Amino acid sequence: MGSSAFEVLTFFLKDYKANTPQKLKIIDAYLLYILLTGINQFLYCCLVGTFPFNSFLSGFISCVASFVLGVCLRLQVNPQNSSNFCGIPPERAFADFIFAHVVLHLVVMNFIG
C-alpha cells in the first residue's frame, strides 16, 4: 500500500516500454516536443513580454492546436481504441491529421499578417 512515487513512476515506465507500440511512442515524442515548445513560449511571454502580440498568440495557439490534433491522432491510431474508431484505418487518421495541420498553419500564417 505504501508505494512511493518513484516506484509508481518506475512501474509506469517499464509498462510503457513493454506494452506501447512503436507508432504510439513516436506520437508521444511529438506530443512531448509540442508541449515543451508551448511551455517555452509561455515562459518567454511571462519573462520578456509579448511585444509582437500577434506572433506570440499565433505561435501559442499553433502549439495548443497541434497538441490537440496529436492527441486525436494518438486516440485514433491506438489499437486499444479500435472499437471506438472501427471505420477509420490508421492511414486515414494520419491523412486527416496532415490535412488539419495544413489548415491550421494556413490560419496561423494568416493571423500573423
From Swiss-Prot:
Q: What does the record give as its pathway?
A: Protein modification; protein glycosylation
Residues that span the membrane, as ranges: 31-51, 53-73, 93-113
Cytoplasmic side residue ranges read 1-30, 74-92
| Domain of life of the organism encoding this protein | Eukaryota
Chief subcellular location equals endoplasmic reticulum
Subcellular location, record wording: Endoplasmic reticulum membrane
Cited Pfam families:
DAD
Q: How does it sit in the membrane?
A: Multi-pass membrane protein
Q: Does the keyword Lyase apply?
A: no
Q: Name one GO cellular component term.
A: oligosaccharyltransferase complex
Q: Does the keyword Transferase apply?
A: no
Q: Which InterPro entries match?
A: DAD/Ost2
Where, by tissue, is this protein expressed?
A: Widely expressed. Greatest expression seen in the epidermis, intermediate expression in the fat body and midgut and mild expression observed in the silk gland.
Induction info: Expression is significantly induced at 4 degrees Celsius and at 37 degrees Celsius compared to the control which was maintained at 25 degrees Celsius. There is a dramatic increase every 5 hours of each temperature treatment suggesting that over-expression is a cell response to inhibit programmed cell death by external temperature stimulus.
Gene Ontology terms describing biological process: apoptotic process; protein N-linked glycosylation; response to cold; response to heat
- Chain's role: Subunit of the oligosaccharyl transferase (OST) complex that catalyzes the initial transfer of a defined glycan (Glc(3)Man(9)GlcNAc(2) in eukaryotes) from the lipid carrier dolichol-pyrophosphate to an asparagine residue within an Asn-X-Ser/Thr consensus motif in nascent polypeptide chains, the first step in protein N-glycosylation. N-glycosylation occurs cotranslationally and the complex associates with the Sec61 complex at the channel-forming translocon complex that mediates protein translocation across the endoplasmic reticulum (ER). All subunits are required for a maximal enzyme activity.
- Entry similarity comment: Belongs to the DAD/OST2 family.
Q: What is this protein called?
A: Dolichyl-diphosphooligosaccharide--protein glycosyltransferase subunit DAD1
The organism encoding this protein is Araneus ventricosus
